[in-house]
Amino acid sequence: MAGIASTVAVMGAGAWGTALAKVLADAGGEVTLWARRAEVADQINTTRYNPDYLPGALLPPSIHATADAEEALGGASTVLLGVPAQTMRANLERWAPLLPEGATLVSLAKGIELGTLMRMSQVIISVTGAEPPQVAVISGPNLASEIAECQPAATVVACSDSGRAVALQRALNSGYFRPYTNADVVGTEIGGACKNIIALACGMAVGIGLGENTAAAIITRGLAEIIRLGTALGANGATLAGLAGVGDLVATCTSPRSRNRSFGERLGRGETLQSAGKACHVVEGVTSCESVLALASSYDVEMPLTDAVHRVCHKGLSVDEAITLLLGRRTKPE
């Protein structure tokens, strides 16, 4: 892997972290995959499978799993951070003393931190003291299970340092996974953080039996919300019209493999938040709707779909009531 260390640390053995570890290995890299639970690491090393998070995907022998963060980070000049958005800070506080100086730190998480309203790249910089050019983001229409099956996919590698971006691009470029570079870190992160919320809304609509017209309206108006927020934060609108915006939004809103859409469907069918949560791994949109709405409010950006999802998830509003609320809004030009 020209331009990048032969060993890359992937911190987080969930579905997405494991899938990207496989991509890196398939592209010719040596990968150390950190798992929070020792039994997950042991299972990966002994069976080459991660049935808890990515069942059915045979992992290459060039992936070594460990539950020891010091072992995972030792000597790695590139660190992919695959933990949930709301645990990013706590994990980084533990790992910061172990991070090699000058390492490229790559966020895989899609969310806005509660309380601080920081994007993940901002959290990374805040905790580690890294310079902004050291921090990159990978985001796009990347359903982990499809990538693990080697189905063709594309993604965005966003970094203000073009050299680091190209090095990551080369490291990830396999026969089935095509990365594109982009200097717009803000737009790439906002697209990834917001699309999960819109996918929840799409799932809710499907869950109560609504059709394609409704889904198309949700996706399109959801994109308008994402663009409004992104541009208010300084994002390039073209980024949000690309893989990290429209691409990720369409995949997450339309695929039955999407956790956020599936969770929304359960809510639409009348399940409680707690009941739906038992059937799904981490669903970032449930938390992100709160932090994204607060961020939008601080910039005076209107996000009615996000507000409706927030009310359903956190304020006790029913899905039917949310639809009535949205349809009752004042009419205006598109």
Curated annotation (Swiss-Prot):
Family matches, as InterPro entries: 6-PGluconate_DH-like_C_sf, 6PGD_dom2, G3P_DH_NAD-dep, G3P_DH_NAD-dep_C, G3P_DH_NAD-dep_N, NAD(P)-bd_dom_sf
GO CC annotations, alphabetized: cytosol; plasma membrane
Positions bound to sn-glycerol 3-phosphate: 110, 140, 195, 248, 258-260
Record's subcellular location: Cytoplasm
Pathway(s) served: Membrane lipid metabolism; glycerophospholipid metabolism
Membership in a protein family: Belongs to the NAD-dependent glycerol-3-phosphate dehydrogenase family.
UniProt-recorded name of the protein: Glycerol-3-phosphate dehydrogenase [NAD(P)+] 2
Organism: Mycobacterium tuberculosis (strain ATCC 25618 / H37Rv)
Encoding gene per record: gpsA2
